[in-house]
């Protein structure tokens, strides 16, 4: 059991105050503190103190004894800690993204390698051969977009902007997946006069439309006034997660985080195809080839947890990670898994022990539990979040 020393990513969209207000993390230079990373990602691994008292990378520690620390099954299947755990603090909208599935990631990665596209090139889509399933768990009210709305809903929302682009009128005549695909690509492809005219029609519709999703379009327009992604809340479900609610983000499904603080768990991948709300490169043909143009009703988007005593388990449809919450009390309970785990203190305080070793966690602090240290005993007040594998 080792307490983690974690790094903060200072992306421009991050909140300057959330990590300080929630977890007392200092921000003397008033930087945006977008993400706190917990894990062993090569870009920014957590660190731990070793037996000699030196501060070392968790990635290096795991590398030295994978089977013991990760567990036999995870070491064999993934060869590394297969997940990255984050606290994400969005003060402004992130780009609309789509993550390719595993098969397409393998093909795309090999193709771009063969073409000799450098890893850091703006037009590089595939940074690795992995998929990137994600779970987001709200710590504060959290605004997001996820998956296409039901087509009847899209039709009704597009009526006030029917004249903005011929592809909108075309979709309204026959609302089906193929025409939605054309509409999606056409809106992203808009340039110059065509784009200015479409956005002017959308903005004039805002004057007469109230409630959602128009309110979300207004919010986004404060940050991206000239981005064709402003049409996306008319096509995608706008989701407001209350604290304690969670949502899984499937491959090939457009989504965006807009505002709020959440825990996010993801597979170890950087494969992102952007689809708006970004100054970065958008590869429209590759994007459209990796999107499933199918509707997902908003009432099916939340992940329903399963309660087992003091544990809330959030079922995940992939093996890359599992996520659960533990309500703590003065009564000792055990936490066990066949894999490594990262425990994060969401609120209150936690005391963990294994044999003679004891560890205290305060809000915002986290610990790495090796597979061979399971089970650990825990008690306290408040809540722990646990990320691990069910292999």
UniProtKB/Swiss-Prot annotation:
Question: What Gene Ontology molecular-function terms does this entry list?
Answer: mannose-6-phosphate isomerase activity; zinc ion binding
Chain sites annotated for binding Zn(2+): 97, 99, 134, 255
Taxonomy, superkingdom: Bacteria
Q: How is the cofactor bound?
A: Binds 1 zinc ion per subunit.
Give the EC number(s) under which this enzyme is classified: 5.3.1.8
A Pfam family cross-referenced in the UniProt record is PMI_typeI_cat
Needed cofactors: Zn(2+)
> What is this protein's function?
Involved in the conversion of glucose to GDP-L-fucose, which can be converted to L-fucose, a capsular polysaccharide.
> What's the protein here called?
Mannose-6-phosphate isomerase
Q: Which gene encodes it?
A: manA
